[in-house]
Amino acid sequence: MMQPEKILGLIGRNIAYSRSPLIHNTACDLLALPYVYTIFNIASADLIEPAIAGARALGIAGLNVTTPYKTTVVPFLDELSPEAASIGAVNTIVNNNGHLAGYNTDIAGFAAPLRPYAQRIKGNPVSVFGNGGAALAAIEAFRIFFHPCCVYLFVRDSAKASAMLENYVHRDIVTLCLIEELFSGESGAIAKIQRSLVIVNATPIGTAGRQNETETSILPLDTELLHPDHIVYDMVYNPLFTPLIKAAKASGAATISGIEMLLGQAARSFELWTGKEMPLEQVRAVLINNLLSSP
């Protein structure tokens, strides 16, 4: 058996559910590459600096970064790619002999399945739910690739969202909106959703087994607002058919599953680390089979 020569991994909090190890280890096995991908659960933000220092010292070849640390890691890296610098969020770290470079592959990963709708999106409003790094990646992808007239960013905490946007150079395309206004029936908020061509869930709401007291619904919005002209994009990938995706299909809307972004960003990260193209369709088949067989 080939002994792993290089370590890859995912840092985040409460990430035992992640399918990233399945994706990357499958790809490495298919290509007979001497890498192993594992999970590094980081309990709190104050441990990020020593964790990054440890990765540097131990020669870990590369890392993915997920919620809630995509912005936290930035000060501890040596270099940022242009797309990571533009939103101040990193989801991929490459270790080149102790020099740590941060990238954001979420942007291209998010954009890929939306490309068939590019002409429809141009000049129309879109809505994004969330106030973390994934939401920022979606906003930047819309700006770079699709040119909507504006992005309605629906959040629960406007102060937190304002802080997130503070260093985002292109924040003028974003209009902050409160999710509570949707659920209370505020007409302006409802009109924004109805006018939006694309609706994106960039929150964990709908993730299998994750509902808690602060997420009283398994849906980010009242799905009665959905209509056949919408394109509904749920970044959640487990379950494969989330409550939002099911409701969107029932309304006649076009839908995009979270596995598309998951695989898109993973393929780019994999290429940055290994210099090889991920065997995407074979990995997709393994991932879908795993998700469908999960309880």
UniProtKB/Swiss-Prot annotation:
The active site is at residue 70. Its EC number is 1.1.1.25. It is an enzyme of class 1 (oxidoreductase). Pathway: Metabolic intermediate biosynthesis; chorismate biosynthesis; chorismate from D-erythrose 4-phosphate and phosphoenolpyruvate: step 4/7. One of its GO terms (molecular function) is shikimate 3-dehydrogenase (NADP+) activity. One of its GO terms (biological process) is aromatic amino acid family biosynthetic process. Shikimate binds at residues 18-20, 66, 91, 106, 237. Gene3D superfamilies: Leucine Dehydrogenase, chain A, domain 1, NAD(P)-binding Rossmann-like Domain. It catalyses: shikimate + NADP(+) = 3-dehydroshikimate + NADPH + H(+). Keywords: Amino-acid biosynthesis, Aromatic amino acid biosynthesis, NADP, Oxidoreductase. Homodimer. Involved in the biosynthesis of the chorismate, which leads to the biosynthesis of aromatic amino acids. Catalyzes the reversible NADPH linked reduction of 3-dehydroshikimate (DHSA) to yield shikimate (SA). Belongs to the shikimate dehydrogenase family. This is Shikimate dehydrogenase (NADP(+)). It comes from Chlorobium phaeobacteroides (strain DSM 266 / SMG 266 / 2430). The gene is aroE.
